[in-house]
Amino acid sequence: MTLQALETIRSCDLIVLPAVSKEECYAYRIVEQVCPEIADMPLLCMPFPMIKDAQKLELAHKRIYDAMEDYLRQGLRVGMLTIGDPGIYSTYMYMHRCAADAGWEARIVSGVPSFCAVAARLGISLGEKDEEIHIIPAAYDVRESLGFHGTRIYMKSGKKLEELLWVLRESMQDKESRVHQDIYGISNCGMENEQVYCGLDELEQAKGYLTTVIVKEHVVQ
């Protein structure tokens, strides 16, 4: 996490956690390592539903925001934790838009995207020269991404990892012999239960919602 994020957390009167409890909140566990005083700060645990029904999702977001706004009306500085960067597939942006639309001052504090942390942990580059970089939410249909060249990053692939690996295996059979793919994966990057995988066979053992898969495609000369 960044120094700005750390200073912002310390300046808040209340911290919102997008989870049932602090023990189940990945973001809280990360922050606690560098900001132990968060254990003594007031917390509001508000789990976000992992659903795709737009109407139900909107109602859930409104309920969560209404709970947060009660504290804003009391004059408190409210912060919300999220893993990675708030601008990349983050639950925070729903609350940010609600607060801004209601006239509150809302600030986005940038963070370290999970796939950048994963690449650093693996010691690899995501893109060089004219290589393309594609970021794909793995919870949705990933088949269209198979035609993308360069580096493909599949985020939060845990729940659909089995399907993703099957699709990748099928695509490797269809690729030209001159096209080579390096496949990596990390579950829970930076945490005490971090696991690193190289190749599809090792990825078969991967578990956890926070699994990032990186596929680097290049042509063998």
Description of each model-found segment:
Residues 147-221:
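A contiguous loop/helix-start segment that scaffolds small-molecule binding in enzyme catalytic cores
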Residues 56-65, 121-124, 147-151, 196-203:
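Short, surface-exposed amphipathic charged segments that create phosphate/polyanion-binding patches used
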Residues 3-104, 203, 210-212, 216-221:
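Class I S-adenosyl-L-methionine
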Residues 22-24, 51, 113-116, 191-193:
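Short gly/pro/ser/thr-enriched loop/turn and capping motifs at secondary-structure boundaries
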Residues 87-148, 204, 218:
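Class I SAM-dependent methyltransferase SAM-binding "motif I" and its flanking Rossmann-like core
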Residues 48-54, 141-143, 191-193:
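A short acidic, often aromatic-flanked loop/helix-cap motif at beta-alpha or helix-coil junctions
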Residues 47, 81-83, 136, 154-156, ...:
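Short beta-strand segments
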Residues 43-45, 106, 135, 183-185:
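Conserved beta-strand scaffold positions in the cores of enzyme catalytic domains, especially
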